[in-house]
Amino acid sequence: MLRCFLLFLLMAVGFGGPALAADGDRRAFVIKNFTLESGTILPAAKVMYATYGTLNAARDNVVLLPSHYMADAHGYEWLIGPGKALDPKKYFLVATELFGNGKSSSPSNTLAPFDGPRFPVTSIRDNVAAVHRLLGEALGVQHLRAVIGFSMGGEQAFQWAVTYPDFMDRIVVTSATAKTWPHGIVRLESEIIAIETDPAFASGDYKEQPKKGLQAFGAIWAGWLFSQGWWREELWRIDAPPGATFRTVFDGLYKDFIPGADANDLILQMRTWEGHDVGTTPGFGADIKRALGSINVPVLYMPSETDLYFPVDDARYETRFIPHVTLLPIPSLWGHTAGAASNPVDAKFLNDHIGAFMEAKGELR
């Protein structure tokens, strides 16, 4: 009943949507014997990616767009195109996909001994290290114009700036923080528990997807995705079909929140999210203040004013320690999804300010 509305929501937060014409074809980069932070070695770590535009002769027009939760490489097309912040005629855009999204190496597509629940937890730093190799080995790229990321993509952008401080000219972060703070871990643990409590989950060795657990996961997620004001003002009516009610909207959200997603994949990426903390980067002694203070490129930090995943106060706290930061909250009732341009007003705000930041020269080192 709410299929059109659900598709809108999934596109808005980057879980799907059509590719731009003649661009965005996905490819695989495979790393043999890739060693994770945990010490586990993946025999063939696969990173899916797509590119838009043309790499220039100097190889200096590259912008990296790392994916967010369960997203594919098409999750940033609200930012790409003529008249938007990232014109493929000017930039060579590389969009990558996190481990665990079901296409890059994931519990659902990896053979024994790392199949299903035996797939090792991967960190944000593992993902960044793999993409660093992709850029150098597959594309011959040694420097980036920018790293731009929404949500878990923003987590990766922060990690890039700490791990590879001279590899890019600037970073843009929307609806994300440099660390998953305790309240965020509470949310993620609640969603993991919701899936694992379903007897059909069978400790991850299920024969069919644990439907009840996935619906419980979706119900919790729905309560955090948008702001209280979004529900109060019934902003869901903007794209809902005629006759939709609060109940049909909520039912449509939780009953099939991420169509086709695998439970172990969902959990793997939540574990990645939980462990995010740039302070635990080797050399910083688990001190996030030191890690943030090491960032030597300009940062455009755009939290959503109503994000329940990444509260704006957490962003304000982190900016105290970042040397060259512009904090620009997104004035929106669309909660977490504001950072992915989930409506025309937020899309214009993001494109205008990210586009201006990309063109700015005075504050660049």
Positions of PLM-derived features:
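N-terminal cap/lid subdomain of alpha/beta-hydrolase-fold enzymes
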Residues: 50-113
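Conserved acidic catalytic loop of the alpha/beta-hydrolase fold
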Residues: 114, 125-145
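Conserved hydrolase catalytic core segment
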Residues: 142-183
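Alpha/beta-hydrolase-fold enzymes
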Residues: 167-168, 173-256
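Short beta-strand/loop motif that positions the catalytic acidic residue
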Residues: 295, 301-303
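Conserved alpha/beta-hydrolase "acid-adjacent" motif
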Residues: 308-314
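Catalytic active-site module of serine/aspartate enzymes centered on a nucleophile-bearing elbow/loop
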Residues: 324-365
